[in-house]
């Protein structure tokens, strides 16, 4: 007796199956734009770690500001770590330093933030750039408040402190400006 042949396999034509085509397009990330202009990310790009990049030009001067911020944070951090007395003297004009440890800890924290700033300079991911700009704005805002409170307690006022306060306010404004510019949705043409 001859062995029975199994029935031939039926091939599914996914090209004609609409549900299957939709699933395939969703997984591959082909097409799929919603009403707001957002392009849906595919599962593959999520696994590979691709982020939504700038779809238009970056705001004018953003990279220059990121570079200036990274240099500023690094410079002050190194000065606080290596020369805490001179940094304190430059800000508070001749006031005596009682302990160098808090100033050096401040330098270590600034050095950590500066590493984040340097890394953000070389990325095109909007989320990372926005977080670093928000970090800068918060840092400069807190520094402005702390120096203002210190002035109110001690009553010391000098040109150096006034320049520090004005520069911190300016840096907050610039960081917030770029934060919102990077977060803006591109205009549809």
Swiss-Prot record:
Subcellular location(s) of the protein: Membrane
Extracellular side: 85-108, 152-155
Transmembrane residue ranges: 64-84, 109-129, 131-151, 156-176
InterPro entries: TP53I11
Entry superkingdom: Eukaryota
Pfam families listed in its UniProt record: p53-inducible11
Chain positions found as Phosphoserine: 14
Record topology, Cytoplasmic segments: 1-63, 130, 177-189
Annotated Gene Ontology cellular component terms: membrane
S-S bonds: none
GO BP annotations listed: negative regulation of cell population proliferation
Membrane topology reported for the UniProt record: Multi-pass membrane protein
Swiss-Prot/TrEMBL induction comment: By p53/TP53.
Keywords from the UniProt entry: Membrane, Phosphoprotein, Transmembrane, Transmembrane helix
Protein name: Tumor protein p53-inducible protein 11
Organism: Homo sapiens (Human)
Lineage: Eukaryota, Metazoa, Chordata, Craniata, Vertebrata
Gene name, Swiss-Prot/TrEMBL: TP53I11
């Amino acid at each position: 007796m001859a062995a029975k042949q199994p029935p031939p396999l039926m091939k599914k034509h996914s090209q004609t199956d609409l549900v299957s085509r939709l699933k395939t397009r969703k997984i591959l990330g082909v097409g799929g734009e919603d009403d707001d202009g957002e392009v849906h990310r595919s599962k593959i790009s999520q696994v590979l770690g691709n982020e939504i990049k700038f779809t238009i030009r970056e705001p004018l001067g953003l990279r220059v500001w990121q570079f200036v911020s990274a240099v500023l944070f690094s410079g002050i951090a190194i000065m606080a770590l290596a020369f805490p007395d001179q940094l304190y003297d430059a800000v508070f004009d001749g006031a005596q330093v009682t302990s160098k440890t808090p100033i050096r800890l401040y330098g270590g924290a600034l050095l950590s933030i500066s590493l984040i700033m340097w890394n953000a300079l070389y990325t095109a991911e909007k989320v990372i750039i926005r977080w670093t700009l928000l970090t800068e704005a918060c840092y400069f805002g807190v520094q402005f408040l702390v120096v203002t409170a210190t002035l109110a307690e001690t009553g010391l006022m000098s040109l150096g402190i006034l320049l520090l306060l004005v520069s911190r306010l300016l840096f907050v404004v610039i960081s917030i400006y770029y934060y919102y510019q990077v977060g803006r949705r591109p205009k549809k043409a």
